[in-house]
Regions:
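Long, low-complexity, intrinsically disordered segments
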Residues: 192-210
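Domain-level signal for Mg2+-assisted phosphodiester chemistry and nucleotide/NA-binding surfaces
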Residues: 1-92, 99, 138, 147
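Nuclease catalytic cores that cleave nucleic-acid phosphodiester bonds
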Residues: 69-190, 194-196
Length: 210
């Protein structure tokens, strides 16, 4: 097996897990994905998030654009952005999880990778990972201990525990830690709040959750 790796990043989940566990979010994505690949060839990295509304949150939109500009300069990384809709007057993500799961399965079906690494603790992705396994693919999960579903751990062939030690040397040079903010904003139905980088918040998932 050639072990071509495709990395799928739940941007909301990663942003808030970094903020809560490492108190900073200025991640060097090239070094991060290289460490996950561990010498295996990278097919491509896909980053998923919601596009901020410049009319509702102009500051958040500006900060997100700066963040996305950095991402788009990362080799072999594609940004996938979903939209927002109002739910009981509150903006929520629209279609991000479906977009990620569809890409993961579509690329598996077309044999574009041998190993899928999903950077998320969201148990909603467990079924997609199992389907990829059924196609003969290896699936790995990169997660924070405070934000992982048991179903994800059960389905994964291999697991990457993310913590402060893992991220040593993976931060972007010359940037200071961004202070935590508590502003309200667009969310997923189960993920209240938002981030300065434009990533809606992810609720912590108990390791006992299925």
């Amino acid at each position: 097996m050639e072990n071509r790796v495709a990395i799928f990043i739940d941007g909301s989940n990663l942003y808030h897990a970094l903020r809560d566990n490492c108190s900073r979010v200025d991640l060097n994505f090239t070094d991060f994905t290289s460490k996950l690949c561990a010498g295996r060839p990278l097919f491509r990295t896909y980053y998923y998030n919601v596009l901020q509304d410049p009319n509702q949150r102009p500051e958040g939109f500006r900060e997100q654009q700066e963040f996305l500009d950095v991402l788009k300069k990362t080799p072999y990384l594609e940004v996938r952005l979903g939209g927002m809709k109002l739910s009981q007057g509150v903006p929520v993500e629209k279609g991000i999880d479906i977009m990620l799961a569809t890409d993961l399965l579509h690329f598996a079906w077309n044999n574009l990778y041998d190993v899928a690494i999903l950077v998320s603790g969201d148990g909603d992705f467990a079924y997609a990972l199992q389907a990829a396994k059924n196609m003969g693919k290896h699936v790995e999960v990169a997660y924070f201990e405070s934000n992982i579903s048991k179903s994800m751990l059960d389905v994964a062939d291999n697991r990457h525990l993310l913590n402060q030690e893992f991220f040593k040397g993976l931060w972007r040079a010359g940037l200071k830690r961004r202070p935590r903010r508590g502003r309200k904003g667009p969310r997923r139905p189960d993920r209240p709040a938002d981030s300065p980088a434009g990533a809606p918040a992810a609720n912590s998932v108990s390791p006992a959750e299925t």
